[in-house]
């Protein structure tokens, strides 16, 4: 993202996973082939504009998920385990809180991936989110604007829940 918050969360996740994870790759620099070589993926995105994926039409400075995701659509993701995380601002954008996360989720599910790491909606205050399925967020939700003090704790709890599904360890 333009603020670097998504990158910081990705790096924190990778650091906490240690040797179990490769270094994070910015989607701007990734190819579909890069992603498809892995059996397990952690994908993250901020929400920009009106609940949109980051990309040129949502005001991002570079191409991002908006341009990359169509390349991933239609790919066979069966046999892959995918965990998602999203960043949003529940106070400033509570009417579309982490909405972009649903686009990653729908693409993963449509491709046949096993999506893990659903996250409780408790502890957040927002009006609406499209990123909720079965009363849970489709991935870890980080609000760095209003709850940055909870970021590490949330990452730790989420990784504890998904680590074995992603790594087999």
Name these PLM-found stretches.
Residues 5-8, 16, 20, 38-169:
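FMN-binding flavodoxin-like domain, especially the glycine-rich phosphate-binding loop
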């Amino acid at each position: 993202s333009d603020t670097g918050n998504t990158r910081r969360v990705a790096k924190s996740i990778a650091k906490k996973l240690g040797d179990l994870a490769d270094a994070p790759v910015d989607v701007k620099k990734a190819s579909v082939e890069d992603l498809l070589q892995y059996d397990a993926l952690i994908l993250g995105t901020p929400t920009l504009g009106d609940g949109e994926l980051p990309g040129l039409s949502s005001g991002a400075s570079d191409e991002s998920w908006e341009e990359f995701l169509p390349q991933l659509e239609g790919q066979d993701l069966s046999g892959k385990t995918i965990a998602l995380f999203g960043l949003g601002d529940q106070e400033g954008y509570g009417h579309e809180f982490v909405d972009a996360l649903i686009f990653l989720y729908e693409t993963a599910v449509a491709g046949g991936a096993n999506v893990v790491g659903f996250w409780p909606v408790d502890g957040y205050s927002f009006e609406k989110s499209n990123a909720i399925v079965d009363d849970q967020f489709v991935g870890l939700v980080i609000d760095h604007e209003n709850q940055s003090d909870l970021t590490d704790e949330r990452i730790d709890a989420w990784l504890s829940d998904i680590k074995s599904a992603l790594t087999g360890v």
